């Protein structure tokens, strides 16, 4: 029906099953991290018609920050347990959710926006050092 917003065509569980690469926890993390990122970039929702779009690069950075807030030094370990070891993994999850109509994208958005945004070891481990007194 024209003008009526379309809801998701599949459940999140179906999308997870169809992609077959990551557990549902990873998809839920990306959804929560997207909300975190949008709020950080655009602030609290004021105008419901205003664009709240974020780029793939912005989302990757937001997901990095969100993971570090949630898990600190264990962030990279938790993500690796879910099979997320590169920023491209975030992109695969996002685009699976787009295909299932859980998320929307612009014509300019592509999976390439998530390619090599940062190195996981540097991005998650660089700020943490254990200092041992000699």
Map each language-model feature to its residues.
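Long, compositionally biased
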Residues: 105-134
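A contiguous binding-surface segment within folded domains or other stable secondary-structure elements
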Residues: 34-68
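Intrinsically disordered or highly flexible coil/loop and linker segments, enriched in small
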Residues: 21, 39-47, 72-76, 103, ...
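N-terminal, charge-rich interaction modules
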Residues: 1-40
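Cytosolic covalent-transfer regions centered on His/Cys nucleophiles
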Residues: 22-26, 35, 87, 95, ...
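Amphipathic alpha-helical packing elements
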Residues: 54-106, 114
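Generic structural signal of hydrophobic/aromatic residues within well-ordered alpha-helices
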Residues: 8-12, 16, 30, 63, ...
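Generic amphipathic alpha-helical segments used as scaffolds and interaction surfaces in large
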Residues: 17-21, 50, 54, 81
